[in-house]
């Protein structure tokens, strides 16, 4: 029941989230560059990739050795939640791996995300 109420509230707030994203995007263009990621779209199709989520800049820096360990034959997607995290992740890993914003926590967006990417781990 709680999840249903959460999803309904989230759905009602989506216009506010988009407005907030546009305001942030006016200050930091990176927020707008991957706006489709926020709704579960705009990803490059990969072959059973490994998803690593690093919320912020500190976590992006912290996964460096982990990413090196998993590289090789594995396709890796690095997801972030902040513009500074995205910028640093693109700088460190963007030449070899896909770097994206994780979609907003709404079941439709998350389902689109996982269905399209077909994540292995």
Kindly label every feature range from the protein language model.
Residues 2-9, 13-16, 20:
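Membrane-interacting alpha-helical segments
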Residues 18-121:
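Active-site and donor-binding regions of nucleotide-sugar-utilizing enzymes
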């Amino acid at each position: 029941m709680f999840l249903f109420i959460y999803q309904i509230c989230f759905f009602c707030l989506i216009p506010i989230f988009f407005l907030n994203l546009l305001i942030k995007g006016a200050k930091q263009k990176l927020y707008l560059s991957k706006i489709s990621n926020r709704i579960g779209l705009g990803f490059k199709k990969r072959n059973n990739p490994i998803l690593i989520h690093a919320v912020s800049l500190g976590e992006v820096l912290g996964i460096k050795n982990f990413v090196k360990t998993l590289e090789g034959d594995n396709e890796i997607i690095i997801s972030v939640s902040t513009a500074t995290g995205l910028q640093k992740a693109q700088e460190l890993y963007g030449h070899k791996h896909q770097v994206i914003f994780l979609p907003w926590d709404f079941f439709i967006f998350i389902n689109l995300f996982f269905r399209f990417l077909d994540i292995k781990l």
